[in-house]
């Protein structure tokens, strides 16, 4: 399973939402993520990908869509 597929599965598992058709939609504004959900997602991403997500960066514009989350994880994996 690739990074994109894994992240989409994580989001679906945690929030019961299939975001594969809304890859560029703001997940906070769409109601998929809230503050607690964001923490859950960070913990799961760190666990699954063996990365450290800077919490101060996660809620910003560069982590608000599925595509941006995928890009951020890939970047952290290669850091």
From Swiss-Prot:
Changes after translation: 4'-phosphopantetheine is transferred from CoA to a specific serine of apo-DCP.
Record gene name: dltC
GO BP term, pick one: cell wall organization
Domain Carrier, residue spans: 1-77
Record's function text: Carrier protein involved in the D-alanylation of lipoteichoic acid (LTA). The loading of thioester-linked D-alanine onto DltC is catalyzed by D-alanine--D-alanyl carrier protein ligase DltA. The DltC-carried D-alanyl group is further transferred to cell membrane phosphatidylglycerol (PG) by forming an ester bond, probably catalyzed by DltD. D-alanylation of LTA plays an important role in modulating the properties of the cell wall in Gram-positive bacteria, influencing the net charge of the cell wall.
Pfam families found in the cross-reference section: PP-binding
Record's subcellular location: Cytoplasm
Cellular component terms per the entry's GO annotation: cytoplasm
Molecular function, one GO term: D-alanyl carrier activity
Record pathway: Cell wall biogenesis; lipoteichoic acid biosynthesis
Similarity-based family: Belongs to the DltC family.
O-(pantetheine 4'-phosphoryl)serine modification, residue list: 35
Protein name stated in the entry: D-alanyl carrier protein
Disulphide bond pairs: none
């Amino acid at each position: 399973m690739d990074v994109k597929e894994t992240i989409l599965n994580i989001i679906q598992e945690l929030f019961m939402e299939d975001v594969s058709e809304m890859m560029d939609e703001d997940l906070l504004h769409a109601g998929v993520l809230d503050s607690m959900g964001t923490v859950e997602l960070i913990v799961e991403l760190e666990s699954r990908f063996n990365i450290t997500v800077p919490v101060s960066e996660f809620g910003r514009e560069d982590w608000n869509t599925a595509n941006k989350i995928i890009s951020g994880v890939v970047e952290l994996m290669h850091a």
